[in-house]
Amino acid sequence: MILFAGSEERGYFLEEPAKTKKMKVEYLGNAISIETQLTAILEKTMQYLVIDIEQYIDKADELATKIESIKRAKNCNVIIYAPGYVRESRIIQELNFRGIRFYIFAVGQADAKEEFERCLNGYYLQMDDPLEEEDRESAQKDMTGKRIGITGVCRRI
């Protein structure tokens, strides 16, 4: 089973990959703090726990500690749904430090579904550390030439 700690509207991208894997998806609904969902999460038996961290107002270190303790208690794969976040965000750094390796950063539902499928297949476990991998890739890029910045561009245009 896949448990989504968030609303059904935000986690709808889980449905198709779950059907492919013959798994059921359950939604907990929105909450301001992870504390309010903690009991419901601990009561369920799941193989994957997808947590929408955008809904919480908890401090980064407290949230990361709670998620780490849930991971240890339930012995399930925890996937963090953080649309629009970057790997350098404080919460992502805290979670990465605590051993959480699966993230969905995509903003669109189609891209989020693709990243979720990668998480299910263990794609991100093949990397030593996602941050180190990105650093190696950026170091290899040719630094000559001009760079410009563009804002407000959709990926599909």
Question: Where do the PLM segments sit?
Answer:
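Walker A/P-loop phosphate-binding motif and the immediately C-terminal alpha-helix
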Residues: 134-157
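Long, basic/Gly/Ser/Thr-rich N-terminal segments
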Residues: 1-132
